[in-house]
């Protein structure tokens, strides 16, 4: 390779390489050039070849590790190659001169290029600063532009709103103008009416004053009349107070008399109650209920035996609520009375065995009743007050132990049970179903078996009290009288349906 080619290649490389790399390669080249003249001045043996080979050999002599061996060989060959070495040295001096010239040129060019590079770098820094400032300004301008655009949009919206408000205000103005015209017209009318009203008001004031004087006179007259009326009313109140006092005294007297009458009525009611209770005791209602039971049973038995149909009237009679209540009460009372009778019978037997012989038959207790002088029988004949008779089912025969029937049964139904024990008659307080306040009234009757109208009549007419007939509801039993002939008819009594 020739020196010019190497120079051209170095120039091309310097042009192609960046500025920093050119500076570093130029420093290495200058250092090699400073050390090359001393090495070239030393003697060296060059074995034929190209210029590049000699240059490389001389460079290797100065830098390789076998420099002593090369010096010895060069001394040996010094005599033989003295002629050729002078030529080579001259050629090398020429090349060195050319290279120094080229190197100087290159250094000058490199210094110029370095100055240009520094200038370009300074320009580039300035340009970069300008670019950054311009970018910053661009950002600021873009933000400003965005703000302006937003403000423009807001102003456009405000403008539209203002336009709408303007339109509304214009329409309102038109409406208000119309209203103003109307109000002005109405104002003129009102002014005219006001003038008319003022005239009317003045006339009313005049009339008011006239009527005021007139009514004041009338009020004074009314006050006078009112004072007269108050005096009259005070006198009337005094009179009424006196009359009220008299009336209160009379009312007190009336209350006292009423209380006395009430006490008298209560005493009369107590007398009536005692008489009714005595009449009920004489009637002996539980035995009648037992008689009703046995007769009902007999009727049902006879109808079954004779294959007869029981009439509907009898069925309705049997289904009567009051009779069912009486039956239920009689069964409960009969159970109690039977237990009491058994205890009394056992006590009597024990007493009879302890006292004396047991062959004596117990006497039958006969209940005697007094007949009031005002009582009448069914035939209308009166009985004297001194006549006393036996009980309702009277009989004076003593009972034997073999003929004693079921306690509580009545005669006339079964011949075997026609006689009763003395203990079968129960006190009216236990056997009377009407004595309890909770017992229901029978077909509008009061608790003594009488109708309320009859009870009031009996209070007014005590002579008719003992003549009142007691009849079971729903039955056609003949009236019970105090006739002594009733003992003969007791076996022939029957219950008939409605």
UniProtKB/Swiss-Prot annotation:
RNA-binding protein that binds specific mRNAs including the ASH1 mRNA, coding for a repressor of the HO endonuclease. Part of the mRNA localization machinery that restricts accumulation of certain proteins to the bud and in the daughter cell. Required for the delivery of cortical endoplasmic reticulum into the emerging bud. Residues 86-272 form a coiled coil. Residues 397-406, 425-449 have a biased composition (Polar residues). Residues 44-82, 328-360, 450-471 have a biased composition (Low complexity). This is SWI5-dependent HO expression protein 3. Signal peptide: none annotated. It is a peripheral membrane protein. Residues 1-82, 328-361, 394-498 are annotated as: Disordered.
């Amino acid at each position: 390779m020739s020196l010019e080619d190497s120079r051209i290649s170095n120039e091309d490389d310097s042009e192609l390489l960046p500025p920093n790399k050119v500076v570093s390669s130029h420093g290495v080249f200058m250092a090699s050039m400073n050390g090359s003249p001393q090495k070239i001045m030393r003697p060296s043996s060059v074995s034929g070849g190209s210029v590049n080979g000699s240059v490389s050999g001389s460079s290797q002599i100065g830098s390789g590790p076998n420099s002593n061996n090369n010096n010895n060989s060069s001394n040996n060959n010094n005599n033989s190659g003295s002629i050729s070495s002078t030529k080579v040295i001259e050629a090398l001096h020429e090349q060195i001169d050319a290279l120094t010239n080229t190197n100087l040129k290159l250094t000058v060019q490199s210094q110029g290029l370095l100055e240009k590079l520094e200038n370009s770098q300074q320009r580039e820094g300035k340009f970069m600063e300008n670019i950054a400032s311009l970018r910053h300004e661009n950002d600021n301008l873009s933000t400003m532009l965005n703000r302006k655009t937003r403000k423009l949009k807001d102003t456009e919206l405000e403008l539209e709103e203002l336009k709408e408000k303007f339109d509304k205000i214009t329409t309102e103005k038109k409406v208000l103008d119309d209203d103003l015209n109307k109000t002005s017209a109405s104002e003129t009318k009102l002014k005219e009416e006001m003038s008319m009203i003022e005239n009317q008001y003045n006339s009313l004031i005049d009339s008011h004053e006239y009527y005021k004087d007139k009514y004041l006179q009338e009020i004074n007259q009314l006050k006078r009349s009112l004072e007269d009326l108050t005096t009259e009313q005070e006198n009337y109140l005094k009179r009424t107070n006196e009359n009220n006092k008299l009336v209160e005294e009379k009312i007190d007297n009336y209350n006292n008399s009423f209380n006395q009458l009430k006490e008298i009525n209560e005493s009369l009611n107590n007398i009536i109650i005692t008489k009714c209770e005595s009449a009920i005791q004489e009637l002996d209602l539980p035995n009648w209920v037992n008689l009703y039971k046995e007769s009902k049973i007999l009727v049902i038995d006879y109808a079954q035996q004779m294959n007869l149909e029981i009439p509907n009237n009898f069925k309705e009679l049997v289904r009567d609520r009051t009779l069912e209540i009486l039956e239920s009460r009689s069964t409960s009372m009969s159970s109690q009375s039977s237990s009491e009778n058994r205890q009394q019978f056992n006590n009597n037997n024990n007493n009879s065995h302890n006292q004396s012989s047991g062959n004596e038959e117990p006497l039958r207790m006969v209940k005697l009743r007094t007949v009031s002088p005002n009582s009448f029988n069914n035939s209308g004949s009166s009985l004297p007050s001194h006549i006393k008779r036996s009980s309702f089912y009277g009989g004076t025969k003593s009972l034997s132990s073999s003929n004693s029937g079921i306690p509580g049964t009545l005669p006339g139904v079964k011949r075997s049970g026609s006689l009763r024990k003395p203990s079968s008659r129960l006190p009216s307080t236990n056997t009377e179903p009407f004595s309890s306040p909770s017992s229901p009234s029978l077909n509008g009757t009061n608790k003594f078996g009488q109708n309320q109208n009859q009870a009031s009549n009996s209070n007014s007419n005590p002579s008719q009290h003992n003549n009142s007939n007691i009849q079971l509801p729903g039955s056609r039993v003949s009236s019970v009288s105090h006739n002594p002939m009733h003992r003969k008819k007791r076996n022939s009594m029957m219950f008939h349906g409605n």
